[in-house]
Amino acid sequence: MFSFFKKKIVVPHVRLTGVIGTAGRFKQGMDLAGQRTILKKAFSFKKIKHVAISINSPGGSPVQSHLIYSYIKQLAKEKKVKVIIFAEDVAASGGYLISCAGDEIYANSSSIIGSIGVISASFGFKDLIKKIGIERRVYTAGKNKSTLDPFVDEKEEDVKRLKNIQLELHADFIKVVEASRGSKLKDPEKNNIFTGEFW
């Protein structure tokens, strides 16, 4: 007896959107704690061969980016499932790092992709508080506890230490991209792939 009914192919789909990290009480951010359940559920379907993940994120916390990336890789390995990534408006910086958990990455011709780098930003308020007559008093135990205090002049050793941390994070990011994309990378140094540039 022949069956004329074809089995439906099931491909679970998850959407990961927003700035990566804990954004605050009234603003939702994307972190592993908030995405763990839905990711686990997507990989829990029986007899699936693929899981599709859409990403729309400009990046954010390098820690949460790597945690989400690692969790997707872990689930894919445990369930022996391939991951297909779809970049929406933007998959940049940490958003691109998460994308590297995919076996394949697809992007629209207008999607913003890349920004493989690390950035830190701050302000200096020393002259401002002096101008308005505010005296700031800080007491610390540990000479480096007030590193990069925005209310005093920058110290060269503080900036150097921050730069070293950034270089370590950047190196880790590059390793993830190289391990994921492999032969798909065309002369990274020549094409500015790891300079923080985006396309």
Could you describe each region identified by the protein language model?
Residues F173-W199:
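Secondary-structure end/capping motifs
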Residues I84-A92, N191-E197:
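Glycine-rich beta-to-alpha transition loops that act as phosphate-gripper elements at the mouths
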Residues M1-V81, V90-L97, A101-S183:
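Small-residue-centered hinge/linker elements
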